[in-house]
């Protein structure tokens, strides 16, 4: 089946837009404009937070709406920058040099004190990503980084969408897995982060092939039940294998729980209450029981992709619904927004997307060009 280059472009553009809206200059992400304590964990937190979701939605509508976002004044993120740098590495090099070029491009983004300050103050780079890149800049070998129990965050799953674009074919699945895993390990040495990154790339590869979204979870579960990922870990990073198996169970159990609640055999179950922001927030809280180090919905390499996927299933090809469900909620809204935006673009292209909005976005031209180059790269790799 021939691939649609417009969807490659839309995937890159809407991933960035999803982040910009979900972040909104750090106002929406993690509810940084709210006055309740972020140390409140459990039902008290989620009751306050879920009602705050309503405020975010009304504030978004009042401030700009779905068609008049003040995009020139809305900041992109470190994750968008790293997604772009990864995409450029894939475009500019051959397969044998993908990882080396990804590492080189990421280090470039922090290679001066001014760039580091911009990353911290302007783009709000995550501590895990920044600390890892500083080590690389100082000459450390990322293959020797220690496994970290608390590094199962979202840095990987927010930048591997481009890998799904260049490896869309079934016979490229192992290449997709290996590259998503190892490129994530550069900054996040934890199995939950690796598996989230693999899932993002996998779902993009399915979307770009027009596979119905409700089927994606079954492809994922089949992959997780196989030994394919296990073998890749054992062959490439054997010292991390025991920890990988332990944390893989956490990842798999969350997806199994999600599948049991939201699917009836092979059919997605619509829950009408999920259209209510407070119910949706409570649903994610009850389902994931946040770890102490990640109290926000969507802050992990596991639940971030689940929330983005769930939002896509509930939204179908309605962009406005996707914005509300994935970008305007309590928690790590920029993470879930960028992943959901990428899923939408790869699956539906520009369907129901306002031309006014993309025209106002000052990165549309650059992202469109990178999407086109990724399309050409995918064609080139498919011929090998």
Language-model segment annotations:
Residues 1-384:
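Structured, active/binding-site neighborhoods that engage oxygen-rich ligands
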């Amino acid at each position: 089946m021939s691939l649609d280059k417009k969807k490659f472009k839309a995937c890159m553009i809407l991933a960035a837009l999803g982040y910009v809206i979900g972040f909104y200059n750090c106002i929406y992400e993690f509810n940084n404009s709210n006055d309740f304590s972020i140390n409140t964990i459990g039902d008290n937190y989620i009751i306050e937070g879920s009602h705050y979701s309503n405020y975010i939605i009304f504030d978004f509508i009042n401030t700009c709406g779905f068609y008049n976002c003040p995009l020139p004044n809305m900041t992109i993120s470190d994750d968008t920058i790293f997604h772009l740098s990864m995409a450029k590495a894939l475009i500019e090099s051959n397969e044998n040099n993908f990882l080396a070029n990804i590492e080189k491009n990421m280090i470039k983004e922090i290679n001066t004190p001014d760039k580091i300050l911009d990353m911290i103050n302007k783009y709000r780079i995550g501590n895990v990503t920044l600390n890892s890149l500083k080590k690389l800049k100082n000459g450390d070998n990322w293959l020797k980084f220690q496994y970290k129990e608390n590094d199962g965050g979202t840095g990987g799953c927010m930048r591997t969408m481009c890998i799904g674009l260049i490896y869309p074919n079934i016979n490229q699945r192992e290449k997709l897995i290996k590259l998503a895993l190892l490129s994530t390990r550069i900054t996040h040495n934890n199995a939950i982060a690796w598996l989230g990154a693999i899932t993002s790339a996998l779902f993009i590869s399915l979307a770009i092939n027009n596979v119905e979204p409700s089927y994606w979870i079954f492809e994922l579960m089949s992959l997780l039940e196989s030994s394919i990922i296990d073998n890749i870990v054992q062959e490439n990073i054997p010292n991390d294998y025991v920890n990988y198996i332990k944390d893989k169970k956490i990842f798999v159990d969350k997806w199994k729980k999600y599948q049991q609640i939201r699917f009836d055999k092979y059919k997605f179950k619509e829950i009408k209450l999920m259209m209510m922001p407070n119910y949706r927030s409570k649903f994610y809280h009850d389902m994931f029981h946040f770890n102490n180090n990640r109290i926000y919905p969507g802050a992990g390499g596991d639940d971030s992709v689940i929330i983005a996927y769930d939002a896509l299933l509930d939204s179908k090809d309605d962009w406005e619904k996707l914005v509300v469900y994935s970008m305007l909620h309590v928690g790590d809204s920029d993470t879930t927004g960028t992943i959901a935006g990428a899923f939408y673009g790869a699956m539906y292209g520009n369907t129901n997307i306002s031309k006014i909005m993309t025209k106002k976005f000052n990165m549309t031209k650059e992202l469109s060009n990178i999407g086109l180059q990724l399309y050409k790269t995918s064609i080139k790799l498919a011929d090998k």
